[in-house]
Every structure is written in C-alpha cells, then in structure tokens.
Amino acid sequence: KVGTFKGSINPNTENFTEFKKFINKNLKDFKNKKIALFCTGGIRCEKASSYMIKKGFMDVNQLKGGVIDYLSKIPKKNSSWVGECFVFDNRVSVIHELKQGTYELCHACRNPINKKDKSSPKYVKGISCPDCFGKISAKKKKALNERNKQIQISKSKGLYNPYLKYTPSDLY
C-alpha cells in the first residue's frame, strides 16, 4: 500500500502464513527463475527466502539491508522504488535519504493512511479510516474517543504521549 519496486509482484499478504499460501498457490512456475525479495529492513526476507529454498526455488535473492538501506544509498533519480517505505516507528513512512514520508497511522486499525484516505468520508480522525470503517465496535469507538481526549490534553500541556508523532531523535 505504501510503496514498492517497479515491476514487482505484490502478494497482498498481511502475515507470513498468508505469504506461504501465496507462494504455494501462485509461484509454482517460478521455481527455476531468479527471484528477488525485499522488505523494510531485510529480516522478514531471511525467513521468506529460507522457506522458498526449502520449497525448491533455485535462485532466491534478497535486497541486502532491506528497502531502508536502499533508500538511504540510492538517489531518487537512479531509483526503481515507487512511493514511500513503511517503517515500524512513529515516522510511519520514509522516502529517499530516509526523509520523513507523508503517511500516518490510523489510530483504530494501525494501518498507514495518506491524504487520499483522510479525504474519504469513512475517515474520522482518531476513530476510523477507509480500511476499518464499519468494523469498529461501539465500545472501541468510545475508547478511541477517550484516547483522543488524552492526546489533546498531553499536546496542550507539552507532555509526552505515545500517540503523538515523534521520531527517535526527538526523544534523545
């Protein structure tokens, strides 16, 4: 959803179990072809490539250091990367030179959201986004409203709140 390499195949999976199913169902004809895997930091690629090799794939490669390393070293003009890269911290996404991206997290489902998502009638700040709208219980909506109040109190008093947007360098 956030970014990818030009020409890559998106398995549209949310976890490793789904990825295994995708491989077994969709990549049978790729066992003798060159395969390049990429992920944010390279860790999940280790697991995926190991699984693929066990399943008989002959030429499985990984992007060393992951997309993060690639974006930090390859200038945008020479890059095959399209979009932003999801990261697992409060930055949410980064672009080339590891500059802050434009995505934020939906407070309800924790999925990345962009300007288009936020312009949807299904987006309610701190409550829902197009991905989770209509899936949130009344109890959770009440809790999310309370969290929003606490965030605003923290913000107005200049206090730390884990839901405010900080980068690691802001904290040290």
Protein language model features and the residues they cover:
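Rhodanese-like catalytic fold shared by cysteine-dependent sulfurtransferases
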Residues: 1-35, 43-172
